[in-house]
Amino acid sequence: MVRHSKNILPKTTNPNPESNRYPPHPADPSHPSRYHLHLQAHHLRSPLLSASAENRRRDPQNLSTTKATSPSTHQSPILPDDIHSILPFAHMNITHTTGQHTENSIRAPSSTTILWHSCQLHSQPSSISSSTKIVSGRVLFSDSSPCSSNPHTQQPSIFSCPTLAGRKLESSGSIFLSTTLPSFIVSIVYLLSVSCRLVPGQTAFTNTNSSVLIDIPILLCSVGSLSLILKEPKYRSYLAIVSPTLSC
């Protein structure tokens, strides 16, 4: 009777036994090969850089503490340097100052006009507002404008908004959507957010200082525009300019 002996594997001597108990984390910067492979497989699924991942990159020692205290918590990996080729808007600085909205806003109606006439969208009046949102959303968050914020850039910005987008439009409905309707909405939103208090039981007109002299003409222009644009279409351009000017 032959007894089969068990194959006993030789024990390997490891100078660092802790490495066998705790294998390297796939997102550990101390292991470049595993680290980059993990990023290539995971950065498309997690395109946002979390604050914890940023802290781990700055302080590698904090990684071991995080694993020891909360091993089940998943941390977002650090984005690679070539993320700009994947996300075209990743280079945009979202933290921006409102002082640059004035000079940046003049580029929005100009770009809308070029897009409107180059793509021949005259048969679709509703596309004016859509194209304006697309262009202005990109322009207002761009801080690369060489212009400086000064009062002289406010007037061209205000006048260009109603005139450039509707200068060569032939349809009366298109002019209404591009000039009169936006100016009416801007004035009403300004009055409701700044000058009025819409709390149940406490509805009131809150402005009591000198700015009330501006709020009253804004309200009159908004109410008067509803009747004038129906009887006298030639006054549409004037109302579209006066109302946003008072709001600014």
Swiss-Prot record:
Residues 10-19, 61-76 have a biased composition (Polar residues). Belongs to the UPF0328 family. This is UPF0328 protein ECU06_0030/ECU06_1690/ECU11_0020. It comes from the Eukaryota. Residues 1-34, 51-81 are annotated as: Disordered. It holds the Pfam family DUF2463. It comes from Encephalitozoon cuniculi (strain GB-M1).
